[in-house]
Amino acid sequence: YEISACLVGSEMCIRDRVPEGFAGQVLKGDAKRIVAMSSTHIAMLDAIGEVRCITGVSGIDYISNPDIQARRDSIGDVGYEGNINYELLLSLDPDLVLLYGVNGASAMESKLEELDIPFMYVGDYLEESPLGKAEWMVVLSEVTGKREKGEKAFAAIPVRYNALKKKVADSTLGTPSVMLNVPYGDSWFMPSTQSYVARLITDAGGRYIYQKNTGNASIPIDLEEAYLLASDADMWLNVGMANSLDDLKASCPKFTDTRCFKNGEVYNNNARTNTAGGNDYYESAVVNPDIVLRDLVKIFHPELVQEECVYYKQLK
């Protein structure tokens, strides 16, 4: 799908910046009242010191950000796609609604156009580079008229990330093989070797065990193939909702005799989950790729990292 929008800096006159013949919406970069439809948008605005601009969200109970929770009585929860409370959305008088479109254009588009409410897609979900995802905070700094703050906030992240990546690469430690995920129905979805999670595993000194998928999306494999992969893996990561080995045993009983399960080398990215089940990994990790990398290095090569894991925990 194609989205047409033009973002102009708040210090410039709009008519001087819009390309001739441009017919899309024009966003002036000085948003003060923002409705964020994804928790990653909240994390990005928080990273650049602009979380107070958020006046509306989607699914407030599942959001981990402490500022949003502290202000929850004054923040509108507009609901989810397919069941948006447009009356509430209008009452929030937003300068901008931030959208995402993982499966195509948002169903909110046409209604927002009808209501003359400015909107913009934040494309972090299209990025496979961990640093590329985080850099979208700079785009949101432009939206809020704080470009310099955004660039400064982002600049330190690749420095820390690449320093740790180099430390791992310069070491003479082994390369543990890593299995990912749990079944969904009768299939087991395995990410591409070029995916966000596979890149993090490689940069942390691990070896993603499924090298067949070199495309641009996860692909399903059958449970038999998944069992063979898990049997060869040194470690098993990102195991759904499991909080313990017993949880994993209940959902994947046939996998309890795999080496990684028997050795207790099973780790999940749900160490920061709130009472409603909202997982901060899917919120703030997008702006903290260096911390996610550090967690994985701690798991693969604990002698290289002193800090304890933030997003990951070992299942007991």
Regions found by a protein language model. Name each.
Residues 30, 40-44, 50, 85, ...:
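Stable alpha-helical elements in mature extracytoplasmic
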Residues 95-96, 105-187, 211-212, 272-316:
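Extracytoplasmic substrate-binding proteins
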